A protein has these predicted regions:
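Beta-strand/loop nucleic-acid-binding surfaces
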Residues: 28-33, 57, 62-75
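Extended, charged alpha/beta regions that create polyanion-binding interfaces
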Residues: 1-36, 40-43, 47, 81, ...
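Short, acidic/hydrophobic/Gly-rich beta-strand patch recurrent on exposed beta strands
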Residues: 17-18, 56-61, 66-68, 85, ...
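Alpha-helical multi-pass transmembrane bundles of energy-transducing inner-membrane proteins
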Residues: 65-78, 89, 93, 243-244
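Extended acidic low-complexity intrinsically disordered segments
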Residues: 51, 63-65, 146, 327-329, ...
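Short, structured coil segments at secondary-structure junctions
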Residues: 61-62, 151, 347
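Conserved glycine-centered short motifs in functionally critical loops
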Residues: 54-58, 90-100, 182-370
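Short small-residue beta-strand/loop micro-motif enriched in glycine and branched aliphatics
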Residues: 26, 65-68, 203-209
Length: 371
């Protein structure tokens, strides 16, 4: 099996695809100016111990995280300094999850002093290279390639890390409807409590005496694609799936296929069984934010605008436009100095940002710098 890591860089963002034998297997977005923080080591202090939650809230650099008793909070009192590692990124409206179990303390970690970020955790490329050391790494950024020279992997620099087919497949991950070969489709509905997934035959199963058999075959064929979409989109926490067509009592026959498909996922999601309504229950660990959260909000929109501007530049920095956008987008970009500096380096000049209170949330446009 050949394994490839493809890293497509744009200002402030690197889209990272993992492919096995040419098939997209895993996907992540890395924002160097605003990483999700998983694996970061912080020097923090206890804000408040909450016995009802069996843990404590800890102030860390730029955030407030939760340290469970089982991960080292037991016995800590308000104001106590503590070295912690982020084990789960902030997501779903909740702050990061922490652990005081950081393993052997690195020699350069300074345990004295106030709240501070002491060390960054691994980025997605490093994680993929660590898990698949025989992979090849391809990127379209000389700057990124130089930054990654310390990794024990061959790095190739090309004009476009994502070909048209891969770019199309990655772009489709932002859609909540997945069209499958043969006409079936998967609809994904994230909610604050869980992720609901509906499998629809799309009219591919005709009536007749063996309608049940056709639905069973359809679901058997869909299940690997379902597990793949869960992994690519990093859907996590409680996941319930309504499979197509089969009576509730007959769905148990699909349990082995679900278990086998989920076994390929490094996070080892668990198939818990079927509810009384016939919904398949899956539990997948929350670590990094799900893709639909990563792709939403003013920062994500602003970085998409920078990607479009960089693509529009080509090799001629004289084509550098100004960006007019909703104020929330401009504010988010101004906070990401890495992204703005990246674009300025490419263009040889800084981007002019114009906050327009008359523009709706999420809206932006390129315009003349002289306008």
């Amino acid at each position: 099996m050949t394994t490839e890591i493809r890293a497509s860089a744009s200002p402030g963002e690197v889209r990272v695809a993992l492919l096995h034998d040419g098939t997209l297997t895993d996907y992540a977005i890395w924002r160097p100016g605003a990483p999700d923080g998983v694996g970061d080591i912080h020097r923090g202090h206890v804000l408040k111990s909450v016995h009802a939650m069996a843990g404590a809230f800890v102030a860390i650099d730029g955030a407030e995280g939760f340290l469970p008793d089982s991960e080292g909070a037991k016995g800590l009192t308000e104001g106590t300094p503590v070295i912690v590692r982020v084990t789960r990124a902030a997501q779903g409206g909740k702050g990061p999850r922490l652990s005081a179990r950081i393993g052997a303390e690195p020699p350069d970690i300074d345990v004295s002093g106030g709240v501070a970020l002491l060390r960054r955790g691994p980025d997605p490329i490093t994680r993929f290279v660590t898990a698949w050391p025989d992979a090849t790494l391809t990127t379209d950024s000389q700057v990124l390639a130089a930054r990654l020279r310390g990794l024990s992997v061959r790095i190739d620099v090309v004009a476009d890390a994502f070909d048209d087919a891969l770019a199309t497949e990655v772009d489709a991950l932002s859609e909540m409807m997945v069209e499958l070969p043969g006409g079936a489709r998967i609809a994904i509905y994230p909610t604050p409590a869980l992720v609901a997934i509906d499998v629809d035959s799309g009219g591919t199963v005709a009536g007749g005496r063996d309608r049940l058999g056709h639905h069973r075959a359809l679901n058997q064929a869909v299940i690997p694609a379902l597990a793949r979409q869960i992994r690519l989109r990093n859907l996590s926490g409680a996941i319930v799936v309504d499979l197509a067509g089969m009576p509730v009592r007959r769905r148990a026959a699909l349990a082995p296929a679900l278990t086998a498909a989920l076994a390929e996922d490094p996070l080892r999601p668990r198939f818990l069984g079927f509810t009384g309504l016939g919904l398949a229950e899956i539990l997948r660990s929350r670590v990094h934010p799900p893709l639909h959260e990563v792709l939403s909000g003013p920062h994500a929109t602003g970085l998409a605008a920078l990607r479009a501007i960089a693509a529009n530049l080509g090799t001629d920095p004289r084509r550098m436009p100004a960006l007019r956008a909703a104020p929330s987008i401009v504010t988010a970009l101004r906070r990401d100095k890495v992204a703005l500096d990246d674009l300025a380096t490419r263009a040889g000049q800084a981007l002019v940002l114009r906050a327009d209170p008359d523009m709706r949330e999420g809206n932006w446009r390129m315009e003349s710098r002289d306008g």
